């Protein structure tokens, strides 16, 4: 079975977006790109690769989205401390959108919007079928 390990988002300013995800969720910068189709920053939490891209042409972005399109629908982070993460999101320019954690450990998440308006779920309880901690393939990478 395939495992989700890469998410790409179209953002207006990849470096600024990268700062948000690095400061709030502790993601690490693993690469950059700047070529004829796009410029971008690549981040990872040790399991998932997140590409923050700004496409330069309609052909590269896809005609159905165009160069002004921003985002995917949402992505989710399984966090250790919900209250601390909420504070960090707001301190970095994110805003609360909807939802609250379910008492007693239900799976529902709290939804925020990052500074670009992309929906970010946060939860201490995880999602069905998801594994919070994994063993890193590369021992130099913290999982």
Regions found by a protein language model. Give the residues of each.
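N-terminal beta-strand motif that seeds the catalytic metal site of vicinal oxygen chelate
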Residues: 1-16, 72-77, 126-143
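Vicinal oxygen chelate
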Residues: 3-12, 41-44, 63-143, ...
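Short, charged/polar surface micro-motifs in flexible loops or helix N-caps
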Residues: 46-50, 57-59, 82-84
